[in-house]
Amino acid sequence: MARIAGVDIPNDKRVVVSLTYVYGIGLPTSKKILAAAGVSEDIRVKDLTSDQEDAIRREVDAIKVEGDLRREVNLNIKRLMEIGSYRGIRHRRGLPVRGQNTKNNARTRKGKAVAIAGKKK
């Protein structure tokens, strides 16, 4: 297994798909990285030469991925909560942030439904 940005990427998959195992790299970013590194998308990870691996590593190092990206996202959310914006308040209360309806659904964000005592008669 090749190791890129601290993540073991699978050997048997195509490079373009394997790079998506790194947090912050999706398919479009993966294609851009390979184009900049001059590596074919169809080649398998196990068939990469060490020069190609180094070129891919250099391109990935130029992008914010894994721990740095997670830290930045968390700091952005924390900043929204501190300034008291609408989005920050929604984050603090554990409700949907992007305007979704909460009358019936939003169970993923709100958690398991809690029964109200004394509802039955």
From Swiss-Prot:
Residues 106-121 have a biased composition (Basic residues). The keyword Hydrolase does not apply. Transmembrane segments: none annotated. PROSITE patterns: RIBOSOMAL_S13_1, RIBOSOMAL_S13_2. The keyword Ribonucleoprotein applies. HAMAP family: Ribosomal_uS13. This is Small ribosomal subunit protein uS13. It comes from Streptococcus mutans serotype c (strain ATCC 700610 / UA159). The gene is rpsM.
